[in-house]
Amino acid sequence: EKISARKVSSIEGLKVNPDFASVNLNEEGWRDVCKALIRRGVWVEAGLWTVADARSLVSSGILDGCVRALVEITEKRPKQAVSLANQMDEVLRRARIKPTILHHGYGQTTWKVLENALALGRDIRVGLEDTLYLPDGSLARGNAQLVGAAVRMVHRRGLLILGLDSPAKTSPGS
């Protein structure tokens, strides 16, 4: 509680609002932090680590202030990682949430999680925070090489990459 109270106090004291802030639903006091951000007009990117987190987001009452639901998979076994991503995605899909659903893997399961996400029609994210390795197992020289591999993965599926040309969302409540 003390940590979330400090976070809320920091949010209330912001001089300049960020476009969005990522809040992990597995952290204590996440609801208070999300509500404080939304009151300030800051979009929330909800970091989901478990099926319970996905359910909590759906029932939280903060979805109108969410720009994105980030399905974060840290499971180390490929089949289990993909299964967990699918279970979390199913909770969000059934609830027909409006925020973008983005999948994000970790370590050796990153590329399996991303491939699965693309098959589901979801957005993906990759960088050195997630993995140091390319899909073929070789060491990446940097973020650009990881992103390049993800772009090729997207193009192989015949999908478009939206980003800078996408219309920006206004702040929550506007």
Where do the protein language model's features map onto the residues?
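Glycine/small-residue-rich loop that forms an oxyanion/phosphate-binding "nest" at active or ligand-binding sites
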Residues: E1-V23
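C-terminal helical cap(s) of enzyme catalytic domains, especially alpha/beta-barrels
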Residues: L134-L159
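Catalytic alpha/beta core domains of metabolic enzymes, predominantly
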Residues: S9-S10, S22-E129, S138-Q145
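Flexible glycine/acidic-rich beta-alpha junction loops that bind and position SAM and/or redox cofactors
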Residues: K2-R6, R77, Y133, T170
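Flexible, glycine/charged-enriched surface loops at secondary-structure junctions
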Residues: L159-S166
